[in-house]
């Protein structure tokens, strides 16, 4: 089973396309929707829904993945639920990048203070990071510097922030999921 979390643009037709692409490596792909506007509520909702999906699935190696803000949530929720994660162009600091876009971006900061201390060290090797060199939203060199001590990083030379085409990375995802 693969759980897919969308980014900030939850209505993008690209989300459906990514789900279809993921079905090439696992027929059981679950799209979990969340508001993107209420971080504390989103975290509670995602924890509940991901936990429920894991319980319903017979997959011994479930995986959670997401793009942008979905990458932020995939890393945290995947860690808390004990499943591997694949994150594309993750928004590592929504408390900064979401200012002016949502009412309470400071809730992300509150979430990070309540998260397990040094969770990345405890999550080491359980997350695959795929970064685009053409990301027009985030500086992925900084993202790589922040994550490289904990996770393997794969660079993509053609995709933009929304990562429309994940197909080039499906086999790496499949191998990571099975490992």
UniProtKB/Swiss-Prot annotation:
GO molecular function, one term: hydrolase activity, acting on ester bonds
Name of one Pfam family that matches: UPF0227
Record-given protein name: UPF0227 protein VC_1892
Recorded family membership: Belongs to the UPF0227 family.
NCBIfam families in alphabetical order: PRK04940.1
Biological source species: Vibrio cholerae serotype O1 (strain ATCC 39315 / El Tor Inaba N16961)
InterPro entries: AB_hydrolase_fold (IPR029058), UPF0227 (IPR022987), UPF0227/Esterase_YqiA (IPR008886)
SUPFAM superfamilies on file: alpha/beta-Hydrolases (SSF53474)
GO cellular component, one term: cytosol
